[in-house]
Amino acid sequence: MPIWVKDTRKEYALAPEGLHQAVCVDVVELGLVKTSFGDKHQIEIRWQLDVEDEGAGLRPLVRRRYTLSLNEKAKLRIHLEAWRGRKFTPAELEGFDVETLVGVNCQIQIVHTLSDDGRKWANVESVVPIGKGMTKIRPSETYQRVKDRNKPGGQVDADGEAVPF
């Protein structure tokens, strides 16, 4: 008997275009990722916006992948320096803990783009500090960091055998 599987692509509400106040809610280590420039160690920074999705009543989550590099041409460095409002010092370039970004407010520019298959995406184009006098926002209590979510495996079935997923 066949077991059918099909594409169940779900449509999500896009984060609105424009400049929005946001708070960093997560930094996810992706490990080595195949890119057009070869295998690169990447991270994903995730932000929640200060607006609510009208349909779900949740704050939109946007994300951007970065190669884990502070090279002067690296998008991560460009965005971090803009976000911090200053250049890295030589000492800071020796090592910067990206985990310190969690909980930090900023403003992000969202731009909508179309992919090759015609889907629309909300992309983080730029990151800048919050303006003077702006009230800081906090991550919503419903967001759970990726590293804190239940990991698959580690469970046993009724016979005491390890479940591999």
Model-derived regions, located:
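Short beta-rich binding modules
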Residues: 1-165
